[in-house]
A protein has these predicted regions:
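A short, structured active-site edge motif that brings together acidic residues
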Residues: 1-12
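Conserved, mostly hydrophobic/aromatic
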Residues: 4, 35, 44, 57, ...
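Glycine-rich beta-alpha junction loops
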Residues: 8-10, 83, 103-107, 129-136, ...
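Glycine/proline-rich, positively charged
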Residues: 11-109, 113
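Short, hinge-like loop/turn segments at secondary-structure boundaries
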Residues: 21-23, 93-97, 115-119, 142-146, ...
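Glycine-enriched alpha-helix->loop->beta-strand junction motifs that scaffold or abut catalytic
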Residues: 73, 91-98, 119-126, 197-199
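Aromatic-lined glycan-binding groove of carbohydrate-active enzymes
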Residues: 110-149, 183
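Terminal-tail/helix-coil boundary detector
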Residues: 120, 148-179, 194-199, 212-252
Length: 252
């Protein structure tokens, strides 16, 4: 089965330029209609707010999203990169089915508060960038391996000393993966899945080879000893550098 999920929130101009974030009810409705038209479908299974708009009460945004459910245009609602208080307020307005937030070996922040909260409320967790934007696959052994026009050039974890420190961690993951005769990325995905049945990783790729590797990670099982070894390599907050150069748009 295919679950069709899409987001709204990043407003763009006709030329594709970024115009900021909007959670205004009228934008929620117009964005949904535009997505339905582009996708050629009569409903969206899971509709996310891409980023919380700090200038619009979450009750107003989710209220408009709830109207889409009532109209049959959307089946379930989701949030992305929302903080605990926002999640509670949103869920009180209309049941939230999924929270999409970055989570991987090198981004373990959700373990602090979010996991206990969403499990209390019965919200599923969708882990984006479970491969650390490709870094955990071992694809980048040198800073020069990153294409010049790639957005990762300006991401803190991929720059300078941070790159080198994080690379040393990944090399240890590569060694563990080699012992299991799997790819580093498969080990990283298996670790995410091992954190709970309510966690769904969504790795992205542009290559069929990597897609097949990611799918095959479903069959990778990690023992308690292996999980301990991985935790010892990548404990909370060991990663050098922030996730983004500007962290103001997350955990709101």
């Amino acid at each position: 089965d295919v679950v069709l999920a899409t987001k709204f929130g990043n407003v763009r101009g006709e030329d594709g330029s970024r115009l900021g974030i909007s959670g205004k009810p009228e934008y929620v409705r117009s964005a949904c209609d535009a997505s339905l038209k582009r996708l050629g479908v009569d409903h969206i299974d899971l509709y996310y707010q891409h980023r919380v708009d700090p200038n619009v009460p979450i009750e107003d945004t989710v209220g408009a999203m709830a109207e889409l459910v009532e109209a049959g245009k959307v089946l379930f609602l989701g949030l992305s990169e929302a903080g605990p208080e926002t999640i509670r307020r949103a869920h009180a307005t209309h049941p939230i089915s999924a929270l999409q937030t970055e989570y991987s070996l090198w981004s373990r922040d959700p373990e602090n508060e979010l996991f206990s909260l969403i499990r209390e409320l019965g919200i599923g967790f969708v882990a984006y960038s479970p491969l650390g934007r490709g870094f955990l696959t071992g694809s980048f052994q040198h800073y020069e391996d990153i294409p010049e026009d790639d957005f990762r050039h300006n991401q803190p974890r991929f720059m300078g000393e941070n790159f080198e420190k994080n690379l040393q961690l990944v090399r240890k993951i590569e060694n563990l993966a080699k012992q299991k005769d799997i790819m580093p990325g498969q080990l990283a995905l298996a670790w995410v899945r091992a954190q709970g049945n309510d966690i769904v990783p969504i790795p992205g790729t542009t290559r069929t080879k990597h897609l097949k590797e990611n799918v095959a990670a479903v069959d990778v099982k990690l023992s308690a000893e292996e999980l301990q070894q991985i935790d010892a390599i990548f404990p909370m907050d060991v990663t050098a550098g922030d996730r983004y150069s500007d962290m103001s748009g997350v955990n709101i």
